[in-house]
């Protein structure tokens, strides 16, 4: 295995671990109908490079193992993250990516809450959408600041 492949595996492992651990640490606000999963900020990495998508998806899967929603969140939540990341990679713009993340998570997690807890779909999809958009728009501004650091972008993110 060459050095670049090892670096990619390690980078994805670190991203996945960070996402999972930090989400579990903020679990009171990271799960449920009204959620502010602050770790979602890092899914915006997918706007810059598809190489981060496996780590982000696995991190979400690991975090959802601790979810009170159980198997529903493991399946639906992880699928939402994967679909959102793919959409973000396609648009390559952090602000459009924030909207994509909000819509995808709102719809899929809203459906999850409807199926698992029989909560009203539309209002819960809206709550998840709003929480996700707040977090991701803050993240988009943070990433716009990071874009000014050419060394960071060229060496670690865009490479």
Residue ranges and their predicted role:
Residues 12, 58-64, 144-148:
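Short, charged N-terminal helix-start/capping segments
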Residues 53-63, 97-105:
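Central hydrophobic cores of alpha-helical transmembrane segments
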Residues 19-24, 56-63, 111:
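Membrane-embedded alpha-helical segments in integral membrane proteins
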Residues 47-49, 61-67:
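Interfacial segments of multi-pass membrane proteins
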Residues 28-33, 41, 68-159:
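Membrane-embedded alpha-helical hairpins and interfacial helices in multi-pass inner-membrane proteins
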Residues 1-47, 51:
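Hydrophobic transmembrane alpha-helices
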């Amino acid at each position: 295995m060459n050095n670049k492949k090892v670096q990619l595996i390690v980078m994805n492992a670190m991203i996945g671990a960070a996402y999972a651990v930090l989400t579990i640490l903020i679990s009171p606000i990271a799960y449920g109908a009204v959620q502010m999963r602050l770790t979602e900020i890092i899914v915006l990495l997918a706007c810059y490079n598809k190489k981060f998508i496996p780590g982000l998806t696995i991190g979400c899967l690991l975090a959802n193992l601790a979810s009170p929603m159980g198997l529903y969140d493991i399946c639906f939540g992880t699928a939402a993250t994967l679909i959102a990341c793919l959409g973000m990679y396609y648009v390559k713009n952090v602000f459009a990516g924030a909207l994509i993340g909000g819509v995808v998570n709102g719809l899929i997690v809203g459906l999850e809450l409807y199926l698992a807890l029989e909560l009203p779909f539309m209002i819960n999809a809206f709550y998840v959408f709003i929480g996700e958009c707040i977090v991701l728009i803050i993240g988009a501004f943070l990433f716009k600041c990071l874009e000014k650091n050419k060394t960071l972008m060229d060496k670690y993110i865009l490479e």
